[in-house]
Structures are given as structure tokens and as C-alpha cells.
A protein has these predicted regions:
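Conserved alpha-helical elements of sugar-nucleotide-dependent glycosyltransferases
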Residues: 18-25, 226
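Radical SAM [4Fe-4S] cluster-binding motif and immediate context
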Residues: 170-274
Length: 274
């Protein structure tokens, strides 16, 4: 059976254009399961959805924040009209905060809330094993509408530090990397620099009312040596100018933050750290 999975990043006009770390980790997980995975990004290619339709995937993942959720819905509608048999999955901060509201959209088959790495893998396994509706109930962090009723499965526990350590590295090879480096922008760095994000930890103990808290209150840290190996590989493979820590709260534990920074000083890679 042909196994094609496509992720698409909706256009968003907030001035920040950076690779989606979570989506690229999910891409790597699905690739390991033998799927042909493609990543399309409207922010860098305005014709991304047409390229996705030409790819004719079995399943599509769309990740959206509030600022891009309506465009995400438009993309789902366009894809479903062209490929009615394709399964469309919506995830990201906005669907996590409001799963019932988005699950009723006609073009959305499933909503993934919270950390999606293993939920999306379970959903791919379900797709290949006969697509029995009753089997969906066993997939944590999954929401959907069945016979007109909204169903939200139990939540999966947040990934532990040891589980974060065994996640594959982001599938940066799926990007048109030179185009990304050329066009990538963010308030933290200068356009045109060769920059990639790295994850040191997930979660934040603060309880700010404006935050959607997708990753939870408890911080889980990755192994320092593994992070150093990843950064060293990224700098070497992509000739980076800078590395950007995309953590919820990098300095929540000053001791761990100093450990990372001291290790980077020892590596002496000659890149900026942000």
C-alpha cells in the first residue's frame, strides 16, 4: 500500500517565519514508520497547497496558531475538495485550546491536542490497520466527531525527559533549506542568517493567563550531551551562523541553563546562541 503523508504550514502574516520544530519531529517519526513524508509551507511558497494536492497524500497534517487557524480551515477545505478520500488532521496551539469548535468543521477529520508525536503515529497505524471507528477510542489526545457527537479521548501524559531524549531529530532535510535561510525572519535575529531552532526543554511552571500552555506546567529537560551532539551536527551539516533555543522557558532552572551554556562554551563552535 502506498503510504503518503503531507504536512502543510498555513500562511501567517505575523513577521515570524521559522521552521516548525514540532511538525518536523513528527515528520521524522512518521518517516521511520515507512511513510513517504513531504512538508509544504505556504509562508515560503504561496503555491504550497497545489504542490500538496499534486502529491496526493493519504493523510494531511495542518498545524495552526490562532492567527493562522482560519487559513488552516481554508486549506483543509481546498484539499478536501480536491482529494475527498484524504484524511485531514488539525493540530497546534489553537486546536488544543478549542478542540470542539474546530472538530465540527466539515473538512477536518481529526484534531490532535497537546503533544502530537505519538498521537499522529497511532493515527497512522490506525489508518493502515483497517480504519475501524471503534479503534479510535484507544488513541490518546485525539478528538473527532462521530455520528454528530464530539468525542475527546483521554489525555496522554506529557513526554518525560527520557522520552524526549529518544525523539528523532527534526526532519530538516524535508525543507528547501536554502530558501528558508534566505527568507526566515524573527524578532530575535537578522534576516538572511543561517539559523535553526533546537529544543532543550518542554513546559513552563508559570501560570500566565494569556498562555495556552500546550506543553504543560512541569518542565522536562533533555540530556545535555545529546543536545550538544545535535547542535554540533546542525552547525556542521548546515553551516549555521546561529542556534536558537525554542524553549517555553529556557531560564526556569538557572542551573540547567548554565550547564547548557557552559557546555556550548566548551564546544567553541563559533556561532551565536539565542
Amino acid at each position: 500500500m502506498v503510504k503518503k503523508f503531507a504536512f502543510i504550514q498555513p500562511l501567517i502574516c505575523d513577521g515570524n517565519l521559522t521552521p516548525p520544530l514540532g511538525t518536523l519531529i513528527m515528520s521524522a517519526i512518521i518517516e521511520k514508520e515507512g511513510w513517504d513524508v513531504h512538508f509544504f509551507d505556504e509562508r515560503f511558497n504561496i503555491n504550497a497547497v497545489n504542490s500538496l494536492i499534486d502529491f496526493q497524500p493519504n493523510m494531511v497534517g495542518i498545524s495552526a496558531v490562532t492567527a493562522s487557524i482560519l487559513r488552516g480551515r481554508d486549506l483543509a477545505d481546498q484539499i478536501k475538495r480536491a482529494l475527498p478520500e484524504t484524511i485531514i488532521v488539525l493540530g497546534g496551539p489553537h486546536p488544543t485550546a478549542m478542540p470542539e469548535e474546530v472538530s465540527v468543521w466539515n473538512s477536518i477529520d481529526f484534531v490532535v491536542v497537546g503533544e502530537g508525536e505519538y498521537t499522529i503515529k497511532d493515527l497512522c497505524d490506525w489508518y493502515l490497520s483497517g480504519r475501524e471507528p471503534s479503534a479510535l477510542q484507544k488513541i490518546p489526545n485525539l478528538c473527532y466527531t462521530f455520528n454528530g457527537k464530539f468525542i475527546q479521548n483521554k489525555n496522554r501524559a506529557f513526554l518525560s525527559s527520557s522520552e524526549l531524549d529518544i525523539l528523532p531529530r527534526p526532519a530538516y532535510h524535508l525543507l528547501n533549506i536554502e530558501e528558508v535561510f534566505k527568507e526566515m525572519t524573527h524578532g530575535l535575529f537578522q534576516k538572511g542568517k543561517r539559523i535553526l531552532p533546537v529544543m532543550f526543554s518542554r513546559g513552563c511552571p508559570s501560570q500566565c493567563t494569556f498562555c495556552c500552555r500546550v506543553m504543560g506546567y512541569q518542565i522536562r529537560y533533555r540530556n545535555t550531551e545529546m543536545i550538544m551532539n545535535e547542535i554540533e551536527s546542525l552547525v556542521r551539516d548546515y553551516n549555521l551562523d546561529e542556534v536558537w533555543f525554542e524553549d517555553d522557558n529556557f531560564t526556569a532552572n538557572p542551573k540547567r541553563a548554565h550547564e547548557i551554556l557552559d557546555s556550548l562554551i566548551e564546544l567553541n563552535l563559533g556561532v551565536y546562541i539565542k
